[in-house]
Curated annotation (Swiss-Prot):
Pfam families: YcgL. HAMAP family: UPF0745 (MF_01866). Gene3D superfamilies: YcgL domain. This is YcgL domain-containing protein VV1058. It comes from Vibrio vulnificus (strain YJ016). PROSITE patterns: YCGL.
Amino acid sequence: MLCSIYKSSKKEGTYLYIPKKDDFSQVPDTLMQMFGKPSHVMTVNLEGRSLALVNIEKVKESLSNEGFFLQLPPPPENLLQQHKERKAQQKND
């Protein structure tokens, strides 16, 4: 299964996967407005490979059912909260 991957011009770390290069017909207009001008990153064959930040099966399922897959950036690390949790755990030990 081939798909083309585009990065967002408005949302850093956000990528849109579609089955056919430059065919955004299945992507809702509101999503395209929020996504901004898509910039083609690459076209890949999803068969027999893995992706770094997303589950390949979810990508394939979404491409088949929805006609696109939207990859959002991971949530930012809350280092302060992690530090507080470690300190609290150290007090309890």
